Amino acid sequence: MKTQLGCSNGPALRILLVQAENLRWRQARSYPYCLNFAFEDGLRANGIECLMVTTPWISRIRDICGEKQFDQVWINDLSHFCDFNISLEEIIDLAPIRVGFVTESVDYYQDEYEAFPWLRERRARIDKQFKYVTHIAAVDEQDVLNLKQRFDKPTMWLPCSMPEGYIYEQVSTPAKKMALFSGSVYGKRVNWLKEPKLKTMLAYQKSPNSRLVDATLFNLLPGHRFGRWMNNRLFPAHHIYPVYLDWLRQLRRKAHTLWLQGMQAGAAVVNLPHLVKGYSSRVIEGLASGRPVISWEIPDRPKNTALFEDGHEILLYSTPEQLATQIERVLSDPDFGERIAQNARNKVRRFHTTEKRVQQIVHWVGATDEAQDYRY
């Protein structure tokens, strides 16, 4: 249902969404839809005038925007913007309010910095981006406190969400009587997948959204790997860019649908330990796909843990033994797994759709420092 946000008697709110996008499908396919293009869906569903500009085209942002005026700029996201050689200085005078999203943790533990030295470098690059924004929305609840203190800017917590249209109503019987993990295999995940206790009940599933045709089309898009020459000032951006964006949307939506359908192949979706200290996109994707989700319980993040009730809407674990027990519960009692999955879908539909999250961001920006409650 479409709602109208903005002035009650005035025009709709106008937001420029600056979206991080990679040039190659090999890297770009790992960008979760629910953390990128979904925000465009959520803005439009709320009656907000939205123009999205992706990073391959940010050098032409003035040509693309033309004479348009904006109330806000949303930068999605600073975690990935720091991977590109791009300055956000261009966006400072595009709108008085500039909201920077952070979809990865900014701060990490000492042992994580030692295992992944690039995290320190990324933090330094992210820190440089904060001077260009007026508001910060972070996925890690501890970062919310730290960033607000360090940069003295309004900061809100931003848990993952899912566009309502991608929440499945009917789900078929799983093809495999196993729990599945889909995603990057790094760090401790390698050992988890080799655990003897888990070998017969947990399988790794390769991403289903890596088809050669889609990868080739993505890489050939204007401004991308093989189409960079079309992002040239000799070509009129206001003609080329809308066509580019339409093709990109189609590829992103198709890949997202294939990803969700792939999650339905197993009896449960497993979220293995990860670096970000908030539920990864895999959790909300698994819940939306209609399968019970068994997730690593993130230490020292009570708000995150409270998003979904353990044993009723999600199943949590901290050790390989606990993970094996939770998987066995689902495999031995399919009705129990279906109840967990249905309860979770109900929760997502009521409180964690992207449409709802967009409303929360807009209202928070309008009433800075107003706390958001996601625990219902």
Locate predicted features:
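Glycine-centered loop/turn motifs
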Residues: D310-G311
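Nucleotide-sugar donor-binding catalytic core of glycosyltransferases
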Residues: K2-R62, D77-S87, S105, D111-I284, ...
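Conserved acidic donor-binding segment of nucleotide-sugar-dependent glycosyltransferases
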Residues: I314-P320, R329-P334
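Active-site proximal beta-strand in glycosyltransferases
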Residues: I91-Y109
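A charged, aromatic-enriched C-terminal amphipathic alpha-helix characteristic of glycosyltransferases
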Residues: S332-V365
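Short acidic/histidine-rich motifs immediately flanking catalytic phosphotransfer sites
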Residues: G66-W74, A267
